[in-house]
Amino acid sequence: MGMRPGRKLDMVKRSFTILWARLPSIGAYLIVLGFIGIPAAAQEQASIMGRTDGGTYYLAAGSPYDRTVVRVRSPHEPGTIVIDTERRFLYLLQQDGTAIRYGVGVGRPGFEWAGIHRITSKAEWPDWHPPAEMRKRQPYLPVMMPGGPNNPLGARALYLGSTLYRIHGTSEPYTIGRAVSSGCIRMRNEDVEDLYSRVDIGTKVVVF
């Protein structure tokens, strides 16, 4: 005999009741209180991300790194981007105590970092200029690669402070959830396009 859909959703929500992380050196933390979903069986399986016209949030089905909405508690103001590099999630804090959560790829061992920056510029289908130290490690890289579907920066880029780091798309979506980059935060193209449309230059970004 199968489990009732509503009970299944309750179990999923309880499984993710309290997840939290903090970075004492900058006082950053974010507590995930749970997914926001609805019990109807058909909608329970729907891969619908975000808010519907009726104001209801849906639980995203599929990959654990699919875009979804979660309840959160954070000292940071709405509109802040908070990135949990250990769990490979990026959160965009909302006004109503929720956050849009996206899966990300992060820096590989030796290329991890943490801090607080602001978005200083934005670009659609950005060109890629691999820094000299990267080309020294990987001599086959070009000096410049024009923007496009094969460009490692993907569909959008959000540049962080005066650093070389960006939040950007990717031509390798299978790397989301992994630590493979040189320090940049990578997202699926459809996710970085969504995030790009929601944030402005000056947005605070907390990485821990």
Protein language model features and the residues they cover:
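N-terminal secretory signal peptides that target proteins for export/translocation
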Residues: 1-21
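Bacterial N-terminal signal peptides
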Residues: 22-37
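Sec/Tat signal peptide C-region and signal peptidase I cleavage site
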Residues: 38-43
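Gly/Pro-biased beta-strand-loop elements
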Residues: 44-47, 55-170, 194
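Short beta-strand-centered segments at strand-helix junctions
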Residues: 182-196
